[in-house]
Curated annotation (Swiss-Prot):
Keywords: DNA-binding, Transcription, Transcription regulation. This is Putative transcriptional regulatory protein MJ0173. The keyword Metal-binding does not apply. SUPFAM superfamilies: DNA-binding protein Tfx (SSF89915). Belongs to the Tfx family. Pfam families: Sigma70_r4, TFX_C. GO terms for biological process: DNA-templated transcription initiation. GO terms for molecular function: DNA binding; DNA-binding transcription factor activity.
Length: 137
């Protein structure tokens, strides 16, 4: 049933049942195992998902045609103009407008920002499809 995935058939089944609202105890009874075993299966599934996500993130950063280092002291409100200018120079249309970009930065780079100022430099990766990835230097 599993095509090519980091998840086992059992992990997929457990995640689907949990999404439907079943408890670990209910799933354990259905599958003829212990609640502790279901807990471990679910935990390992989530770990595998996180590793897969991080692998894709690393790959995207390697393949990104453009990365911009946002320097310490930069006003957050200046960042969209920096990003749009660099993307335009490379012929890449960014998928975000100014407000969406500021929100993305706020969500993904909050540890680098204090009030409206960058306190520690970070990078913004611009992917070929116009998507962005925000992360450490």
């Amino acid at each position: 049933m599993v095509e090519d995935s980091f998840l086992t058939d059992t992990q997929i089944k457990v995640l689907k049942l949990r999404k439907k609202g079943l408890t670990q105890e209910e799933i354990a009874k259905m599958l003829g195992t212990s609640r502790a075993n279901i807990s471990m299966i679910e935990k390992r599934a989530k770990e595998n998902i996180k590793k897969a996500y991080n692998t894709i993130k690393i790959y995207n950063r390697i393949m990104a045609p453009l990365s911009i280092e946002i320097e310490e002291g930069t006003d957050v409100l200046e960042i969209p103009d920096i990003v749009f200018k660099k993307a335009d120079e490379e012929g890449i249309k960014v998928k975000y407008n100014t407000l969406e970009l500021i929100e993305l930065i706020k969500e993904n780079a909050s540890e680098f920002i204090e009030k409206r100022t960058v306190k520690k430099k970070f990078k913004i990766y611009i992917l070929e499809n116009g998507d962005l990835d925000v992360g450490g230097s």
